[in-house]
């Protein structure tokens, strides 16, 4: 009985730790948002996310190359995003990275949204709408990625099936 307070304290600590571990989701990112595949990789991508938020595309690509987490869906999504948004966009490279992200994590909302936008940039409305349908299934409730791609598709259609960058 003398050890009962210590045992109860240990039990409470373990219970709280397991609740926190079960509840820990992906940390919000400056841009682009996406579910993550692992905490260590997420932390190693923080510098690249900061460069992306600052719209320093070339520097972000160099940082991502330095990290070289090719087996991480977020890394591939960020590489695709940076290549697509660069001053001289490299759409084939962006598509390769988005596809790699989706091979690793088929429901990766960021890669689904951004690859849909890439398809609009190429004038490929049917493939963009496929991505929108995939996002509709991936998002249990309306999510930002679905709403953003839906808006991009609407702008595309309203502009005579020509890509219009986000305002």
Model-inferred region functions:
Residues 39-68, 84-85:
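Alpha-helical segment of the N-proximal tetratricopeptide repeat
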Residues 25-39, 129-167:
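Terminal, low-structured helical/coil segments at or just beyond the last alpha-helical repeat
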Residues 78-79, 114, 148-152:
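Canonical tetratricopeptide repeat
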Residues 53-54, 85-87, 121, 138, ...:
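Register position in tetratricopeptide repeats
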Residues 54-59, 87-100, 123-131:
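Structural signature of tandem alpha-helical TPR/SEL1-like repeats
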Residues 67-70, 104, 137-141:
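Structural marker of alpha-solenoid helical repeat scaffolds
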Residues 75-77, 111, 145:
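TPR alpha-solenoid repeat register
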Residues 1-42, 167:
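Long, contiguous interaction/recruitment modules in multidomain scaffold/adaptor proteins
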């Amino acid at each position: 009985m003398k050890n009962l307070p210590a045992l109860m304290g240990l039990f409470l600590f373990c219970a709280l730790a397991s609740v926190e571990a079960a509840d820990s989701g992906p940390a919000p990112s400056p841009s682009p948002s996406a579910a993550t595949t692992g905490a260590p990789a997420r932390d190693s991508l923080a510098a690249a996310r900061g460069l992306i938020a600052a719209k320093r595309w070339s520097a972000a690509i160099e940082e991502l190359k330095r990290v070289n987490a090719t087996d991480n869906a977020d890394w591939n999504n960020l590489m695709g995003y940076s290549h697509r948004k660069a001053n001289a966009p490299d759409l084939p490279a962006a598509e390769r990275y988005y596809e790699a992200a989706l091979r690793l994590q088929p429901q990766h909302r960021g890669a689904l949204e951004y690859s849909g936008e890439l398809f609009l940039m190429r004038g490929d409305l049917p493939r963009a709408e496929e991505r929108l349908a995939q996002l509709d299934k991936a998002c249990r409730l309306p999510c930002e990625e679905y709403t953003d791609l839906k808006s991009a598709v609407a702008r595309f259609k309203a502009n005579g099936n020509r890509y219009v960058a986000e305002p």
